[in-house]
Amino acid sequence: MDDEEETYRLWKIRKTIMQLCHDRGYLVTQDELDQTLEEFKAQSGDKPSEGRPRRTDLTVLVAHNDDPTDQMFVFFPEEPKVGIKTIKVYCQRMQEENITRALIVVQQGMTPSAKQSLVDMAPKYILEQFLQQELLINITEHELVPEHVVMTKEEVTELLARYKLRENQLPRIQAGDPVARYFGIKRGQVVKIIRPSETAGRYITYRLVQ
């Protein structure tokens, strides 16, 4: 792939990552959300084949709006298929900086042992992997994807009381659903899904993540 195409891809992926962090409630500046391709080139370079930028230069660390101690790394490994050695390096860095959550943007996937290590480290360390292909567009901006809002525990309690429901009576959404993964929604959480409706203005449904 030539430098121009690769630079464009890296810019698109980083832009989606910034939007994802923002949508999860992490502090991201408007400048980062609005960064143009030209600004990305000026900041990071436009010759990936010569290491400008290297993927590792794109590493992001964000802090949550509600709790600045709740921080999350976003790693961009160099190797196309990520192995256990890289995961150990990331984990070491997370331990040193006392950070328990990270996203890993991979080019082609992970080796079986690297995948297993993510499972073994949970729930102490939460590492989520995204294929870069998934991040070339922001799925939540697609016109067919309705608005998703993650509900707080208090909102769920109020919802169940209002409709005299038990949690297990709510319809389900899979934790592996692309939109659920985008928001980092965990099993047991409830999502409010808002769709436009010609008759009611908007139509709201609730889904329990399983």
Swiss-Prot record:
Tell me which domain of life the UniProt entry assigns to the organism this sequence originates from.
Answer: Eukaryota
- Give the GO cellular component terms, alphabetically: cytosol; nucleoplasm; nucleus; RNA polymerase I complex; RNA polymerase II, core complex; RNA polymerase III complex; RPAP3/R2TP/prefoldin-like complex
Q: Which PROSITE patterns does the UniProt record give?
A: RNA_POL_H_23KD (PS01110)
- Which UniProt keywords are given for this protein, alphabetically ordered? Acetylation, DNA-directed RNA polymerase, Host-virus interaction, Isopeptide bond, Nucleus, Transcription, Ubl conjugation
Keyword field contains Transcription: yes
Kindly indicate whether the keyword Nucleus belongs to this entry.
Answer: yes
Glycyl lysine isopeptide (Lys-Gly) (interchain with G-Cter in SUMO2) cross-link: located at K81
| Subcellular localization | Nucleus; Nucleus, Nucleolus
Q: A GO BP term, please?
A: tRNA transcription by RNA polymerase III
Where does the UniProt entry say this protein principally localizes? nucleus
Q: What InterPro entries would the database entry show?
A: Arch_Rpo5/euc_Rpb5, RNA_pol_Rpb5_N, RNA_pol_Rpb5_N_sf, RNA_pol_subH/Rpb5_C, RNA_pol_subH/Rpb5_CS, RPB5-like_sf
The molecular function terms in GO held by this entry are:
DNA binding; DNA-directed RNA polymerase activity
Q: Which residues carry this modification: N-acetylmethionine?
A: M1
Described function = DNA-dependent RNA polymerase catalyzes the transcription of DNA into RNA using the four ribonucleoside triphosphates as substrates. Common component of RNA polymerases I, II and III which synthesize ribosomal RNA precursors, mRNA precursors and many functional non-coding RNAs, and small RNAs, such as 5S rRNA and tRNAs, respectively. Pol II is the central component of the basal RNA polymerase II transcription machinery. Pols are composed of mobile elements that move relative to each other.
Give the similarity note.
Belongs to the archaeal Rpo5/eukaryotic RPB5 RNA polymerase subunit family.
According to the record's subunit comment, the protein's assembly and interactions are: Component of the RNA polymerase I (Pol I), RNA polymerase II (Pol II) and RNA polymerase III (Pol III) complexes consisting of at least 13, 12 and 17 subunits, respectively. Pol I complex consists of a ten-subunit catalytic core composed of POLR1A/RPA1, POLR1B/RPA2, POLR1C/RPAC1, POLR1D/RPAC2, POLR1H/RPA12, POLR2E/RPABC1, POLR2F/RPABC2, POLR2H/RPABC3, POLR2K/RPABC4 and POLR2L/RPABC5; a mobile stalk subunit POLR1F/RPA43 protruding from the core and additional subunits homologous to general transcription factors POLR1E/RPA49 and POLR1G/RPA34.
Q: What is this protein called?
A: DNA-directed RNA polymerases I, II, and III subunit RPABC1
Which species is the source of this protein?
Homo sapiens (Human)
- Lineage per the UniProt record: Eukaryota, Metazoa, Chordata, Craniata, Vertebrata
